[in-house]
């Protein structure tokens, strides 16, 4: 057992798991709306091509991986998960409000880039609850039974409950169990792309209406009119990157790792959460 694991045992002599649920958007990654738009646009077009027995567009995952690594994944997050591997009983789960199929897809791509696999299941919009005001919320009590079931399969824990659990999220009011929330600063770096970059020209000429539907544009009479409307949308989207410089030196996950290492072995989990909430 390495030094960090020995320190961990001072907090959890029975090797109780410490479960960190981590939000996806604006916590692990920045503003990924451009990539979501591209992903669903390709799906829309391929659905049409499949119906008419035409060759479908191949989504360029290599390009996505490059952009995840360089721009979209929050700085130092990959180092954070490598540091987590040094601890015997810290368990990472994803808890996002994103739609289920997209969340599972993009998380698998993130895992390939950072060379780390999160615990399963991945908690998504399907695992949200509706509060008394009719708003969707995350709830530790909802996902906890599924976490216990998953950890029991590892056969390294003997547990009926989880003593140490928290959610790291950039939103203040997202969690029902507010005492378990570690709010982090928002990471909103946006890597803007041309949404048409993967679409062959011959396919675009025949199916540009699908692009218009995706971006809620009025149908054009010809390709020229389409391009005029499309580039107005694209230019507006590029303007949304104006705040990117504010996020270039983000150190949240670096500081989180440092605080965790310095304090995990010498304070209660409740006090540790209080310290982690102070990280900027």
Model-based region annotation:
Residues 72, 77-109, 125:
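Substrate-recognition element of Asp-dependent hydrolases with the DxDx(T/V) motif
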Residues 13, 56-72, 238-248:
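Intrinsically disordered, low-complexity acidic Ser/Thr-rich regulatory segments
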Residues 25-33, 174-175:
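Short acidic, Gly/Ser-rich segments with clustered Asp/Glu that frequently serve as metal-coordination loops
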Residues 16-28, 88-91, 161-169, 180:
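Core residues of folded domains in eukaryotic genome-function proteins
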Residues 1-22, 31, 37-47:
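Non-catalytic pre-domain segments flanking phosphatase-related domains
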Residues 15, 22, 62-74, 92-99, ...:
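Amphipathic alpha-helical protein-protein interaction segments
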């Amino acid at each position: 057992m390495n030094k960090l694991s020995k320190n961990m045992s001072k907090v959890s002599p029975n090797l109780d798991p410490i479960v960190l649920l981590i939000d996806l958007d604006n916590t692990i990654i920045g503003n990924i709306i451009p990539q979501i738009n591209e992903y669903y646009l390709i799906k829309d077009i391929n659905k049409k091509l499949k119906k008419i027995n035409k060759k479908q567009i191949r989504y360029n995952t290599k390009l996505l991986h490059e952009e995840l690594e360089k721009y979209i994944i929050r700085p130092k997050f990959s180092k954070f998960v490598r540091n987590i591997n040094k601890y015997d009983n810290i368990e990472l789960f994803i808890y996002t409000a994103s739609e289920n199929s997209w969340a599972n897809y993009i998380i698998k791509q993130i895992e390939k880039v950072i060379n780390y696999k999160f615990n399963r299941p991945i908690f998504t919009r399907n695992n949200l609850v509706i509060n008394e005001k009719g708003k969707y919320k995350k709830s530790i009590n909802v996902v906890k039974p599924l976490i216990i079931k998953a950890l029991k399969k590892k056969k390294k824990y003997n547990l009926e409950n989880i003593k140490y659990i928290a959610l790291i999220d950039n939103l203040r009011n997202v969690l029902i169990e507010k005492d378990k929330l570690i709010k982090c600063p928002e990471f909103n770096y946006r890597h803007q792309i041309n949404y048409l970059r993967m679409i062959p020209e011959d396919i675009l000429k025949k199916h540009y209406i699908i692009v218009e539907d995706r971006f809620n544009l009025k149908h054009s009479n010809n390709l020229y009119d389409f391009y005029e409307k499309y580039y107005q949308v694209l230019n507006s989207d590029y303007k949304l990157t104006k705040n990117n410089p504010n996020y270039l030196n983000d150190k949240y996950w670096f500081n989180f790792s440092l605080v965790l290492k310095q304090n995990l072995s010498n304070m209660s989990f409740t006090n540790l959460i209080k310290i982690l909430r102070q990280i900027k």
